[in-house]
């Protein structure tokens, strides 16, 4: 394909290579099996249906398989879908590689690490700084590679680090506006809040939940890691308890996955920053393929809303 899958619009033909990110077998109303495929490249992903499959198809078109595909982009209930005309698995003769299809953060991993470490250097409370530095160093490589989620926001290679860097920048601006905020707590909370996802999620390709992720979740994982780090570093103080509270409450409410609601000011601010960055990322992704004067496809995680790009934004999409 001359352009990435995320930049295709309704009515356009697709003829190129895509990665099967997920393949889910389902049964149609006529009782015949079919596959729902999530296909992607380094720009994004699109859903497709493979109808009337055989057992051989089911065994062939599986997760992490690169395929050559032809078809057309259609609108299905407000979302883009690829209508498949032909599909085949690739071979060595095609000269394509898995890494070519993995979407990555727009910043280099080492640059993001340098920036995060600079924020850690600005943490003056020795207990908070030591715990934060200890845990980041422990999970450094996974932190730089992991996505921030399986779907919805920052669900790409190095997405976790990019999410953290973006949140730190927001946090710094808020501290300049509200200087009574505890910078040490807020920076540490931002850096650590999703670090448990390096154990909760399987990686950047075909991201799924690990057994530990399903049974415990990243919030409980990181709360426990903070306690263990404090023990190893022989740190005993209220800072440990407050850091754990920031982690346990950063989703805001029980129905959103938090065991506790925020009752420390920096915990509430952490939750708000997390929410802002995640939602802006989702809206940006939805509007990437939209021309001025058009609505995006529906975003399930944002109340199934379609977002409008104002018509006075005349600059065309750069493909």
Curated annotation (Swiss-Prot):
SUPFAM superfamilies linked to this entry: HD-domain/PDEase-like, Nucleic acid-binding proteins
Enzyme class, first EC level, given as a word: hydrolase
Stored NCBIfam families: PRK13480.1
Name by which UniProt lists this protein: 3'-5' exoribonuclease YhaM
HAMAP family: 3_5_Exoribonuc_YhaM
EC number: 3.1.-.-
Job of this protein: Shows a 3'-5' exoribonuclease activity.
CDD domains per the UniProt record, alphabetical: HDc, YhaM_OBF_like
InterPro entries per the UniProt record, alphabetical: 3'-5'_exoribonuclease_YhaM, HD/PDEase_dom, HD_domain, NA-bd_OB-fold, NA-bd_OB_tRNA, YhaM_exoribonuc/phosphodiest
Pfam families: HD, tRNA_anti-codon
Record's keyword annotation contains Iron-sulfur: no
Domain HD: residue ranges: 163-279
Annotated DNA-binding residue span(s): 12-90
GO annotation terms (biological process): rRNA 3'-end processing
Record key words, sorted: DNA-binding, Exonuclease, Hydrolase, Nuclease
Lineage: Bacteria, Bacillati, Bacillota, Bacilli, Bacillales
Sequence similarity: Belongs to the YhaM family.
Record GO terms (molecular function): 3'-5'-RNA exonuclease activity; DNA binding
């Amino acid at each position: 394909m001359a352009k990435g899958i995320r930049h295709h619009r309704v009515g356009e033909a697709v003829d190129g290579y895509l990665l099967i990110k997920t393949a889910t077998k389902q049964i149609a109303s006529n009782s015949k099996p079919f596959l729902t495929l999530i296909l992607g490249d380094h720009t994004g992903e699109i859903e497709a249906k493979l109808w009337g499959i055989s057992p051989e198809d089911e065994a062939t078109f599986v997760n992490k398989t690169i395929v050559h595909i032809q078809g057309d982009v259609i609108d299905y209930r407000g979302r883009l879908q690829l209508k498949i005309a032909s599909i085949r698995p690739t071979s060595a003769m095609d000269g394509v590689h898995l890494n070519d299809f993995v979407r990555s953060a727009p910043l280099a991993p080492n640059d993001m690490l340098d920036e995060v470490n600079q924020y850690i250097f600005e943490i003056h409370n020795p207990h908070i700084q030591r715990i934060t530095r200890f845990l980041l160093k422990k999970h450094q490589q996974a932190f730089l590679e992991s996505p921030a989620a399986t779907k919805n926001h920052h669900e790409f290679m190095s997405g976790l680090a990019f999410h953290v860097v973006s949140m730190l920048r927001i946090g710094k601006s808020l501290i300049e506006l509200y200087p009574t905020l505890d910078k040490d707590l807020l920076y540490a909370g931002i850096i650590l809040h999703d670090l448990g996802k390096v154990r909760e999620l399987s990686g950047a390709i075909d991201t799924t939940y690990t057994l530990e992720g399903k049974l415990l979740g990243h919030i409980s994982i990181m709360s426990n890691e903070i306690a263990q780090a404090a023990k190893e570093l022989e740190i005993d103080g209220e800072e440990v308890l407050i850091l754990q509270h920031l982690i346990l409450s950063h989703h805001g409410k029980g129905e959103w996955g938090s065991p506790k609601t925020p009752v420390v000011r920096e915990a509430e601010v952490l939750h708000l920053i997390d929410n802002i960055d995640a939602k802006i990322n989702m809206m940006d992704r939805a509007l990437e393929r939209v021309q001025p004067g058009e609505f995006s496809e529906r975003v399930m995680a944002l109340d199934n809303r379609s977002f409008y790009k104002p018509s006075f934004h005349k600059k065309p999409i750069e493909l």
